[in-house]
């Protein structure tokens, strides 16, 4: 008889095997214990969140505070305002991260907004 196997993964340091289960990349949402596990409505067209997109092999979209202090010129960000989804590309971000950020933004539009959001590209500088 075989027994179940339990593995531990640390956020931001996930194993290749674990990350392989998420073909579209990983999304880290704000909340958890600190928020009291409050329900977040992702399908509402009134959503307001900022996602920091990083990674080459495994794309990680991490929810960060919606503030100019969160931005930097070396990375890509997605500003999700519900009916509009802005793809913000820093002046020093690489082509691969731009492509991945576009894929994440398209996924949000198609899967979380049922195609009802407008995608808008913004270049820094």
UniProtKB/Swiss-Prot annotation:
MF-aspect GO terms: actin filament binding
Cell location: Cytoplasm, Cytoskeleton; Cell projection, Podosome
GO CC aspect terms: anchoring junction; cell projection; cytoplasm; podosome
Gelsolin-like repeat windows: 59-99
Keyword Phosphoprotein applies: yes
InterPro entries according to UniProt: ADF-H/Gelsolin-like_dom_sf, Gelsolin-like_dom, Villin/Gelsolin
Cytoplasm among keywords: yes
Gene3D superfamilies, per the entry: Severin (3.40.20.10)
Listed transmembrane segments: none
Alphabetical UniProt keywords: Actin capping, Actin-binding, Calcium, Cell junction, Cell projection, Cytoplasm, Cytoskeleton, Phosphoprotein, Repeat
Function according to Swiss-Prot or TrEMBL: Ca(2+)-dependent actin filament-severing protein that has a regulatory function in exocytosis by affecting the organization of the microfilament network underneath the plasma membrane. In vitro, also has barbed end capping and nucleating activities in the presence of Ca(2+). Severing activity is inhibited by phosphatidylinositol 4,5-bis-phosphate (PIP2). Required for megakaryocyte differentiation, maturation, polyploidization and apoptosis with the release of platelet-like particles. Plays a role in osteoclastogenesis (OCG) and actin cytoskeletal organization in osteoclasts.
Protein name per its UniProtKB record: Scinderin
Species the sequence originates in: Sus scrofa
């Amino acid at each position: 008889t075989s027994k179940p196997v339990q593995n531990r993964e640390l956020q931001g340091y996930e194993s290749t095997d674990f990350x392989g289960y998420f073909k579209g990349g990983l999304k880290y949402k704000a909340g958890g214990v600190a928020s009291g596990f409050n329900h977040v409505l992702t399908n509402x067209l009134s959503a307001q969140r900022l996602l920091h997109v990083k990674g080459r092999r495994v794309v990680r979209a991490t929810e960060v505070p919606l503030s100019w202090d969160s931005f930097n010129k070396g990375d890509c960000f997605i500003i999700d305002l519900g009916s509009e989804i802005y793809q913000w590309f820093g002046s020093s971000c690489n082509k691969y991260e731009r492509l991945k950020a576009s894929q994440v933004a398209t996924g949000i539009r198609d899967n979380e907004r049922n195609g009802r959001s407008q995608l808008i590209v913004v270049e820094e500088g």
